[in-house]
Amino acid sequence: MQPKLVLENTIYTLEQLVSFNAPQIALAGRSNVGKSSLVNTLAGRKGLARTSSTPGKTRSINFYKVDPDGYYVVDLPGYGYARCSKAEREKWAKLIRRYLVETPAVCAIAILLDCRLSPQKLDVELAAFARQAGLPLLPVLTKADKCKQQERALRQREWRTILGGEVPLLFSSKTGMGKDKLWQELHRLAFPDMAFDTPSDGAPEPADEPEAASERAE
């Protein structure tokens, strides 16, 4: 049975933050990387998270409760949108940092990376921040359907090198690629002490052959 997402709270300042004891996994990424589309894909319906072709539209922290598991997926404002004023960019960057550092329930960061782009400076900096903060990192390459197999494999190799061996998950909101695997990884991060079933061969998917698992029916 697929979990359900329920929008439980939206805040614009940390003073509005409601204390949740349940684990929280932050969704972070550049503006227009596809966070809202990813949330809607996980939910299995359009409209739960508002999407826009204009970068930088999400200017709040949205808390989605995962039922029946009880943990939260927290959608953070996108970063790096050049058309925002410097003061506004700094305001939201500060809010994101404070949330990640000052919220004990945050147990991991899912960093969304545009599969079409080589590693970007702000993404690399966020990955380094997560390591310094001791937060597990789940890298997700979004918009993978827009890239050919060779480009997907290249992007996975680039990020594997940067992340010290961690291979990003391929994901597409359009085709559903990686949806089931992402749910599995989110649950694993929320409840790290629980035992999980592993693939029959027990081996991770090779980085240079990413299509093997992703092209199977979700």
UniProtKB/Swiss-Prot annotation:
Single GO BP term: division septum assembly
Domain EngB-type G: 21-192
Superkingdom of the organism of origin: Bacteria
Region (Disordered): 194-218
Keywords attached to this entry: Cell cycle, Cell division, GTP-binding, Magnesium, Metal-binding, Nucleotide-binding, Septation
Pfam families: MMR_HSR1
Gene3D superfamilies from the UniProt entry: P-loop containing nucleotide triphosphate hydrolases
Annotated Gene Ontology cellular component terms: cytosol
Obligatory cofactor(s): Mg(2+)
Residues reported to bind GTP: 29-36, 56-60, 75-78, 142-145, 171-173
PANTHER family the record matches: ENGB-TYPE G DOMAIN-CONTAINING PROTEIN, MSS1/TRME-RELATED GTP-BINDING PROTEIN
Family from the record: Belongs to the TRAFAC class TrmE-Era-EngA-EngB-Septin-like GTPase superfamily. EngB GTPase family.
Role, per record: Necessary for normal cell division and for the maintenance of normal septation.
NCBIfam families linked: GTPase_YsxC
Name of this protein: Probable GTP-binding protein EngB
Native organism: Oleidesulfovibrio alaskensis (strain ATCC BAA-1058 / DSM 17464 / G20)
